[in-house]
């Protein structure tokens, strides 16, 4: 189904791209836009993950450069029966994360330095498990392609405003076309974000909670990231708002309630769903990360059997953060 949705979305974005081309250059502009869109669709399918990671200055790490994070991702990927994804770190103070890649065999998980510094080990595991769930559900292809193509449409629309519309007829249609560009660019980006079903976040929350075995780890992380999104700006995301739907929490602003134009479900609703899941499958009770004991030990065995209700580190949350 993900590939079918991707095809429909690409067709819609191509049509929008052609419309923008027509407004700029008439029939010839639409034809050029069609050719460019076809080439861009092919290029995006194979390269969009690298483009998004580069956009955020993400640096790939391995077991030597980031051993704790790398081993955590490896263990959770094993529990999810996924190939080991590439691991990236973004130098950004806002705690957040996203996954990208056209399929599980070519996937990547990217986390910010803010996420690593501000979350406990347990919360970080919940976030990583959520991103792995997106990979397992093949959401990453749709998220990455829509982000890159929506960004391209916005750039073309901005160029059109500078260019001045269809100069073959400046007596009215050119001006109207320019005004239409002002409306279509943000509207197109909004429609792209709306096209990514918000229900996938609930599905990734549930699957991620089952992967790590502790729904409340993710619930605590969501609350902390949501609060930080109001206080710590993500300037890279502000420059590329079409990528906002890729993150676990909207990096632009917190969403107080579900609404037609939201890129993410309400965090309160997501936490409530995770609380219900915790009551169903078991796991630790909810405690905000600020109450965790800083003197507790770090991770124990990685040989915990798979299954619901048990964490990969022995069942009970440990207070020490993942980075000492």
UniProtKB/Swiss-Prot annotation:
Q: Which residues cross the membrane?
A: 7-24, 29-46, 145-165, 172-192
What EC number is given for this enzyme?
A: 3.4.24.-
Keyword check for Transmembrane, yes or no.
yes
Q: How does it sit in the membrane?
A: Multi-pass membrane protein
Q: Where in the cell is it found?
A: Cell inner membrane
- Coarse class of the primary localization is membrane
Q: Got a GO cellular component term for this one?
A: plasma membrane
Name the catalytic site residues. 131
**Keyword set for this entry?**
Cell inner membrane, Cell membrane, Hydrolase, Membrane, Metal-binding, Metalloprotease, Protease, Transmembrane, Transmembrane helix, Zinc
Q: How is the cofactor bound?
A: Binds 1 zinc ion per subunit.
| Names of the cofactor(s) | Zn(2+)
Q: What class of enzyme is it?
A: hydrolase
Tell me the domain of life. Answer: Bacteria
Instruction: Give the residue ranges for region: Disordered.
Output: 288-324
UniProt GO MF annotations? metalloendopeptidase activity; zinc ion binding
Skewed-composition ranges (Polar residues): 288-305
PANTHER family xref list? PROTEASE HTPX
Q: Which family, according to the similarity comment?
A: Belongs to the peptidase M48B family.
The molecule here is called Protease HtpX homolog
Provenance organism = Rhodopseudomonas palustris (strain TIE-1)
Give the gene name: htpX
């Amino acid at each position: 189904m993900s590939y079918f949705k991707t095809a429909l979305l690409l067709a819609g974005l191509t049509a929008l791209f052609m419309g923008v081309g027509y407004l700029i250059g008439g029939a010839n502009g639409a034809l050029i836009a069609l050719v460019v869109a076809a080439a861009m669709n092919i290029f995006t399918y194979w390269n969009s993950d690298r483009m998004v990671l580069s956009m955020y200055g993400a640096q790939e790490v391995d077991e030597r450069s980031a051993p704790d994070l790398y081993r955590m991702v490896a263990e959770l990927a094993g529990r999810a029966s996924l190939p080991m994804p590439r691991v990236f770190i973004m130098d950004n103070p806002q705690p957040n994360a996203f996954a990208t890649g056209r399929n599980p065999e070519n996937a990547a998980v990217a986390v910010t330095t803010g996420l690593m510094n501000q979350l406990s080990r347990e919360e970080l595991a919940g976030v990583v498990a959520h991103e792995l769930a997106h990979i397992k559900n093949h959401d990453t292809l749709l998220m990455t392609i829509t982000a890159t193509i929506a960004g391209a449409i916005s750039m073309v629309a901005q160029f059109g405003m500078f260019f001045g519309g269809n100069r073959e007829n400046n007596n009215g249609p050119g001006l109207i076309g320019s005004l239409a560009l002002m409306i279509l660019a943000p509207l197109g980006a909004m429609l792209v974000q709306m096209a990514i079903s918000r229900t996938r976040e609930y599905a990734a929350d549930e699957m991620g909670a089952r992967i790590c075995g502790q729904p409340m780890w993710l619930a605590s992380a969501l609350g902390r990231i949501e609060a930080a999104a109001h206080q710590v700006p993500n300037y890279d995301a502000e420059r590329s708002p079409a990528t906002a739907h890729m993150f676990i929490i909207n990096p632009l602003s917190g969403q107080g309630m579900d609404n037609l134009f939201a890129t993410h479900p309400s965090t309160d609703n997501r936490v409530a769903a995770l609380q219900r899941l915790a009551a169903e499958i078991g796991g630790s009770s909810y405690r905000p990360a600020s109450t965790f004991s800083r003197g507790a030990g770090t991770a124990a065995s990685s040989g915990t059997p798979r299954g619901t209700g048990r964490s990969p580190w022995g069942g009970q949350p440990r207070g020490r953060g993942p980075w000492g």
